[in-house]
């Protein structure tokens, strides 16, 4: 990139903030993030960052902050509703990667990224309370109509617009006005974070199923709690939506859920060494939403506009890959703009580098979801072999040692 350019990123989530840091590190123009929320707060629950994305964040200078905050996940362990191990596999460094797989609170990761952006790019780099409403390309510029928290219209312009504005992306809607609705996986999820006793080695993710396809996923996400001999546990309870009696496609990541709705599905579980009832009842806030994704796009952007993260490739959480792919999007976008002085061509290079991988993961996550639910009702001996095959196939498709 020879001439300085102005870049607007719609959305100051994990993908948008990572992209801003990568663009700044590459010395590419002036970067401004527009965030529709009036205040960026550490919301959400736990997520996983895969080794490739951890490496990318380390190269942005965030390795020490991650290590001080997150849990390096060592093992993925599948168990039955009695707590007996069905299948397990190593993760992160234990699986031969040079970098760990980190489990971390989404809000804490966002705050790490936000602090780095404000320190390196300046406080003015993140403008809150501005939601994108109108987009137009004219004379080699992207013109954006936004509205602030008081309803006052704002006019902005840039050489590049990056839509990192999430599942209900305004930028994606502009680029793909005929987009299909969210695709429902037929699963309702309840999620929460609970201060809990340490379990197993304090670095293990557990996945438990019963024969009725109710599922629990739980893993620790806080280095601070671990240092105190305890765990901050992220948990997800998944139940077929038909059993819940609702099929809601309106995904809202901050919708409140109710203990009395989720607890009956796990009332007869006895994991022995892990008290699921205690985990759920000690939780302060329960979130509820459907498991959804979007069909892969044949192209992401056009001209001087592109997408990244959930705006480009919303995927099921089965492979714990969504946030990692958003981070890798941002890294590749910065690299493409650094290589190519033609902005539009650089954006297409970025898309060609990232879209096939992201689309493959969308489909692989759908397939893994079907296969794991199908394996739930099998006898234990068959289930072990099935899970070994499922996880091995997934690794071969979407993971690579880092």
UniProtKB/Swiss-Prot annotation:
Pathways per UniProt: Secondary metabolite biosynthesis; pyocyanine biosynthesis
Binding site for FAD: 14-15, 35-36, 43-45, 106, 132, 191, 310
Taxonomic superkingdom: Bacteria
Region Disordered, residue ranges: 368-402
Catalytic activity: 5-methyl-phenazine-1-carboxylate + NADH + O2 + 2 H(+) = pyocyanin + CO2 + NAD(+) + H2O
A GO molecular function held by the record: monooxygenase activity
Biased composition annotated in UniProt, kind: Basic and acidic residues: 368-385
Cofactor(s) in the UniProt record: FAD
InterPro entries: FAD-bd (IPR002938), FAD-dep_Monooxygenase_BioMet (IPR050493), FAD/NAD-bd_sf (IPR036188)
Record key words, sorted: FAD, Flavoprotein, Monooxygenase, NAD, Oxidoreductase
Gene3D superfamilies: 3.30.9.30, FAD/NAD(P)-binding domain
Assigned EC number: 1.14.13.218
Function statement: Involved in the biosynthesis of pyocyanine, a blue-pigmented phenazine derivative, which plays a role in virulence. Catalyzes the oxidative decarboxylation of 5-methylphenazine-1-carboxylate (5-methyl-PCA) to pyocyanine. Can also act on phenazine-1-carboxylate (PCA), converting it into 1-hydroxyphenazine (1-HP). However, PCA is a poor substrate.
UniProt subunit comment: Monomer in solution. Probably interacts transiently with PhzM.
Protein name (record): 5-methylphenazine-1-carboxylate 1-monooxygenase
């Amino acid at each position: 990139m020879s001439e300085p350019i102005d870049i607007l990123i719609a959305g100051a989530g994990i993908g948008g903030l990572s992209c801003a840091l990568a663009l700044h590190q590459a010395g590419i123009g002036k970067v401004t993030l527009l965030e529709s929320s009036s205040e960026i707060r550490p919301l959400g629950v736990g997520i996983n960052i895969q080794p490739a994305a951890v490496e990318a964040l380390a190269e942005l200078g965030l390795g020490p902050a991650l290590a001080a905050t997150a849990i390096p996940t060592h093992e993925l362990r599948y168990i039955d509703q009695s707590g007996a191990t069905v299948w397990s596999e190593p993760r992160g460094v234990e699986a031969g990667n040079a970098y760990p797989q980190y489990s971390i609170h989404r809000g804490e990761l966002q705050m790490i990224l936000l602090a780095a952006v404000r320190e390196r790019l300046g406080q003015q780099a993140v403008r809150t309370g501005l939601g994108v409403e109108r987009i137009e390309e004219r004379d080699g510029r992207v013109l954006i109509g936004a509205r602030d928290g008081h309803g006052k219209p704002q006019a902005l312009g840039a050489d590049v617009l990056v839509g990192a504005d999430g599942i209900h992306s305004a930028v994606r809607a502009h680029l793909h006005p005929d987009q299909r609705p969210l695709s429902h996986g037929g699963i309702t999820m309840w999620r929460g974070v609970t201060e809990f006793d340490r379990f197993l080695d304090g670095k293990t993710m557990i996945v438990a199923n019963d024969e009725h396809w109710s599922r629990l996923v739980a893993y620790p996400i806080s280095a601070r709690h671990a240092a105190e001999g305890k765990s901050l546990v992220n948990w997800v309870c998944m139940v077929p939506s038909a059993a819940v009696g609702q099929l809601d496609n309106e995904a809202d990541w901050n919708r409140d859920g109710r203990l009395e709705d989720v607890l009956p599905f796990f009332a007869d579980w006895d994991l022995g060494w892990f008290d699921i009832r205690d985990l759920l009842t000690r939780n302060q806030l329960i979130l509820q939403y459907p498991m959804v994704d979007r069909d892969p796009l044949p192209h992401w952007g056009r001209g001087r506009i592109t997408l990244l993260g959930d705006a480009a490739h919303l995927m099921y959480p089965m492979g714990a890959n969504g946030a990692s792919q958003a981070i890798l999007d941002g890294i590749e976008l910065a690299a493409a703009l650094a290589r190519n002085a033609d902005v539009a061509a650089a954006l297409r290079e970025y898309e060609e580098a990232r879209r096939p991988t992201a689309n493959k993961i969308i489909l692989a996550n759908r397939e893994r979801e079907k296969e794991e639910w199908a394996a739930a009702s099998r006898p234990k001996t068959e289930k072990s072999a099935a899970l070994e095959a499922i996880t091995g196939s997934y690794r071969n498709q979407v993971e690579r040692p880092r």
